[in-house]
Amino acid sequence: MAKVESFELDHTKVKAPYVRLITVEEGPKGDKISNFDLRLVQPNENAIPTGGLHTIEHLLASLLRDRLDGVIDCSPFGCRTGFHLITWGEHSTTEVAKALRDSLKAIRDDITWEDVPGTTIESCGNYRDHSLFSAQEWCNDILKKGISDDPFDRHVVED
């Protein structure tokens, strides 16, 4: 089996919440795609419940696109500790961390249920498994710790 970078990462060494650049891939025509680890909670210490994670996922799909050029996808990790963010081009971890921080602030402070996209049977494959309350509580906890642009040393991004 092929080696997967995220399974090679020593999860005992990282200090969440953080943004980590996993890789930049270059296509045959020179286009670049970046893959980021948006780790919201410390691995093997906690996990975001599916309802909250699902709601954060739907909101980040829009909020990150509002704050960062070239977003292709933002998908949750199966371990429920964060997300993969895939973008066109290259962004610094600081730039991504600020966009993530501002998106989580919006979820915590500004979002109402009516703002959450994709919560109907027609628009979501598991529309019953959402919790804005859980999403906002988790965002509050994550923001209290601050988002670091370094996975191994706490370097919290400021305004």
UniProtKB/Swiss-Prot annotation:
GO terms (BP aspect): quorum sensing
Per its UniProt entry, which superkingdom is the organism in? Bacteria
Which Pfam families does the record cross-reference, listed alphabetically?
LuxS
> What's the Enzyme Commission number for this chain?
4.4.1.21
* Reactions catalysed: S-(5-deoxy-D-ribos-5-yl)-L-homocysteine = (S)-4,5-dihydroxypentane-2,3-dione + L-homocysteine
* Cofactor or coenzyme needed: Fe cation
Q: Which SUPFAM superfamilies match?
A: LuxS/MPP-like metallohydrolase
Main EC class the enzyme belongs to: lyase
The family database entries (HAMAP family) matched by this protein are listed as: LuxS (MF_00091)
Instruction: Outline what the protein does.
Output: Involved in the synthesis of autoinducer 2 (AI-2) which is secreted by bacteria and is used to communicate both the cell density and the metabolic potential of the environment. The regulation of gene expression in response to changes in cell density is called quorum sensing. Catalyzes the transformation of S-ribosylhomocysteine (RHC) to homocysteine (HC) and 4,5-dihydroxy-2,3-pentadione (DPD).
Q: Which family does it belong to?
A: Belongs to the LuxS family.
The protein's name: S-ribosylhomocysteine lyase
Q: Upper taxonomic classification of the species?
A: Bacteria, Bacillati, Bacillota, Bacilli, Lactobacillales
